[in-house]
Amino acid sequence: KAEIVLDPTMLLTVDEWRQIEKKPKYKVKQKYILVYFLGKLDFYRQDIKEFAIRNDLQIINIFDIDDEKHYCTSPEEFIWLVENAMIIFTDSFHACVFSILFHKSFKVFKRKEIGFEDMFDRVESLLNTFRLQDNIFNGNNIDELNVSDWNYVEDILQILREQSMDFLCNALN
């Protein structure tokens, strides 16, 4: 039987990630949406733009090759941007992880490119584990920012961290 352990990024605490994070060199407005899509953003670009306008938020899209300033964001800066964002819009597993760790509002979008539909299983499993399925964008719920039960998330995270560390320590001995 295969043992399921947490993704390594979840084994570190928020305080440990804060020691790693770094504020970007470029100027960041006080309120912004962090957009991080590994797949094509085209399917959702208009929804996100309209959300930003309605909520008077800057958009920081860190995986847009046309925006060199933000495209060159380092991993340390990425972590800082997640922690300080008003909301995160993403299709990335790890952007979801950091949103969860920092208790941030986020919406996760399914990739629509052919061949990538099944990549969502990992994200869905993560969200189900922490009862965060309502954070999945369903086509018309972009304005529904769910109030997550972060106490529940932290309780489950602590249990899973302990189980994962026990397994890894035993496996390495």
What does each model-found stretch correspond to?
Residues 1-173:
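Active-site anion-handling motifs in enzyme catalytic cores
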